[in-house]
């Protein structure tokens, strides 16, 4: 009965208000500091800050962090080391740390395809100076479109394609691992 009284009096205060949503989101992400949330057609993107790191989550799954991980080095260095004289690189997903690792090689062009334009917008907005320089690098081209769609439509030839997407556990992710 107390909860019903609470609902009757307090829910109308939050009706059509962002404050209830902000409260619920900050409660969901405790103890992290929620910097921003934004909806896209691919899901809700949440930007969290914890100490020196800024982390980006899409539908509650971490998709990018401003802290470099060993995963970024593994994903980029292995194919570039095994390939000979790669000048034109296509990077599907994975974020800016992969670009930073690729730039350690004498490449001429990096095309970074990120499906979610809202994620790209938030990455640019919440990047520090070190990361921001990657966005402004003249050999880096960022394209916001579906990676598989891009591969089917491009006429460019790439010396190396680096795929940094989710494992093929869902139909959406499996598209990158099939011929159909």
Task: List each language-model region with its residue ranges.
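The AdoMet/dcAdoMet-binding core of the Class I SAM-like
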Residues: 69-180
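Basic, ligand-binding patches in group-transfer machinery
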Residues: 2-63, 69
């Amino acid at each position: 009965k107390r909860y019903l009284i609470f609902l009757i009096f307090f829910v109308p205060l939050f009706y059509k208000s962002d404050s209830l949503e902000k409260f619920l989101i900050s409660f969901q992400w405790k103890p992290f500091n929620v910097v921003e949330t934004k909806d896209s057609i691919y899901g809700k993107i949440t930007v969290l800050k914890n100490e020196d790191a800024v982390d980006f989550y899409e539908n509650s799954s971490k998709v990018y962090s401003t802290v470099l991980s060993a995963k970024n080095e593994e994903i980029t260095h292995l194919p570039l080391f095994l390939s000979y004289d790669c000048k034109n690189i296509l990077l599907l997903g994975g974020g800016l740390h992969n670009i930073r690792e690729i730039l350690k090689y004498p490449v001429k062009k990096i095309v970074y395809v990120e499906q979610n334009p809202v994620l790209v917008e938030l990455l640019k907005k919440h990047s520090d100076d070190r990361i921001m320089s990657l966005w402004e690098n003249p050999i880096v081209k960022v394209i916001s479109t579906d990676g598989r769609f891009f591969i089917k439509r491009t006429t460019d030839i790439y010396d190396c394609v680096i795929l940094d997407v989710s494992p093929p556990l869902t139909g959406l992710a499996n598209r990158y691992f099939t011929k159909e």
